[in-house]
Amino acid sequence: MRAALIVLWMLLCSVSSAVAQVSIGINLSLYPELVPVPGYPVYYAPRMEANYFFYDGLYWVYQGDTWYSSSWYNGPWWIARPEVVPVFVLRIPVGYYRRPPVYFRGWRSDAPPRWGEHWGRDWERRRTGWDKWNRSSVPKPAPLPVYQRQYSGDRYPRLEQQHPLHSQQYRYQPRDTVVRQHYREQAARSARTPAQRGDQGALQQGSDRQPHQEPPRGQGQGQEKGRGRDEERGRERNR
């Protein structure tokens, strides 16, 4: 019991340091169709070409060997390190990943991915018991935040608008201790100004907003040359 409490404490302490806001290339114009995974408190998106799930009040995406979470269907997305991914997300059977990575090949479709084999012994030691549970006492799936269907396209809220809307229209409180920590961290960050977050407003939604865009090739050089000619003419007039 004591060992389990120590592991849980380590997980909670690492959640905040694991969270970072990123753009993952998912750009949904409408609320996705979400279907329950039989026997699990999880939903998946059968029509999406993405490993897109919903569990305990948050959306979860597995992409590029990384887990991401968000309280809104189109992000922004926050990194969840392997050490702080909820166990029922880790337990989702391989067959419900719509874009399974290459290393899933050969694994049973009705069983969870072999995360210990993939992430190594150190991870497996920290997350011991993740793949063992009483299937007769699985919690019920959380209700979907279907109010978000009315927020699509240009109506999709900015980060600072999301938490107030969510808290007003979605009364469900996460049961999972780790999810509650993720949820609190995301809510706290959304309450900050862009300057306080340090995100420069560039990573709000999907792939249409890039963290950095370089000017067209030659444009910066042309501007520098133009400024140089203007300065030279000014010096000639002052002589």
Regions found by a protein language model. Name each.
Residues 2-3, 76:
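Short helix C-cap/helix-to-loop transition motifs enriched in small/turn-promoting residues
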